[in-house]
A protein has these predicted regions:
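Short helix-capping segments at alpha-helix termini
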Residues: 17-22, 84, 110-114
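Short, hinge-like loop/turn segments at secondary-structure boundaries
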Residues: 16-17, 42-46, 107-109
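Glycine-rich beta-alpha junction loops
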Residues: 3, 29-36, 93-96
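Short active-site-adjacent structural elements
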Residues: 35-37, 77, 90, 97-102
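Conserved, mostly hydrophobic/aromatic
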Residues: 27, 89
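Active-site-adjacent beta->alpha loops and helix N-cap segments on the catalytic face
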Residues: 2-20, 96-106
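Catalytic-face loop-and-helix region of soluble metabolic enzyme cores
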Residues: 28-84
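Extended, intrinsically disordered, low-complexity segments
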Residues: 95, 110-125
């Protein structure tokens, strides 16, 4: 479930639980680094992107500043939903890994240097 506000996610989960839904509800986060992309996602999904978020992003002339803002915004949002009891977070890359990696780095999540695709238990040979 894509969202832009931790309260929206928490409210959705609360309503779902009252309706008898017992499965995990994993919040989805799209890194906020490109206002045009966010508008397209809004048009496709009907999920409103806060105007203040779009305005803030549009105010940065350099993509590097948008990326920094998006990583900070994303990490705060992730911390908020995890604090609210989310079982995890789904990060949407839409074929752009860097913004997701920036969020993870800001949160202190780093790749395991010992991991390789060949050693992964789900790799088929």
């Amino acid at each position: 479930q894509l969202f832009w506000d931790a309260e929206v996610y928490a409210s959705f989960v609360e309503r779902a639980r009252r309706a008898g839904v017992t499965i995990p509800i994993v919040p989805g986060l799209l890194p906020a680094t490109d206002p045009a992309r966010l508008r397209r996602v809004q048009d496709l999904t009907g999920i409103e992107v806060p105007e203040q978020l779009l305005t803030t992003l549009a105010g940065f002339e350099e993509q590097e500043r948008r990326d920094e803002f998006g990583a900070a915004f994303g990490s705060r949002l992730i911390h908020s939903v995890l604090d609210a009891g989310a079982p995890g977070v789904h990060l949407y890359t839409f074929n752009k890994a860097k913004p997701v990696l920036d969020i993870l780095a800001l949160m202190g999540v780093t790749p395991d240097p010992q991991w390789s695709p060949a050693s992964h238990p789900f790799t088929h040979h």
